[in-house]
Amino acid sequence: MEHTYTVALAGNPNVGKSTVFNRLTGLRQHTGNWPGKTVERAEGYFSQAGQRFRLVDLPGTYSLAADSPEEEVAGAFLQSGQADAVIVVVDASCLRRGLILALQLRQQTQRLVLCVNLMDEAARRGVTPQTERLGQLLDVPVVATAARSGKGLAELRRE
């Protein structure tokens, strides 16, 4: 039996984590446009190149220091060592806020991928994140996505 890798999906509230989760797993996790929408973790599976992955959608958190029950759930899972990799989803329009969590996780996980989501909305606001440069600075793979339309998710699956 092949090994199933566990991938945590982390990020600030309201950055599209559940939309990314739904697109990758094919499930229908309820999504909403308000912080605190996901209050417990959800799990789903997907396969890529013959490998099976368990994707864990965590509640939104701003850092590993918990200030709410939702952040406690996310922080406990992220610090438990259960994840083989972490995808940190950030809002393309508000990178600074999301990078705090990404930098904290970068220090404690060997496999981190930064998913710069909501690229379509950022473009409408005239914001164009330098994703290639960001990847060089952080020394992690960076994937630009617009999860609602599915743009960039094939590349995210490969990472």
Predicted regions and their residues:
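Conserved GTPase G-domain signal focused on the G5
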Residues: 16-17, 148-159
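Conserved G1/Walker A P-loop phosphate-binding module
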Residues: 1-66, 80-81, 85
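Conserved C-terminal guanine-recognition region of P-loop GTPase G domains, centered on the G4
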Residues: 44-50, 73-143
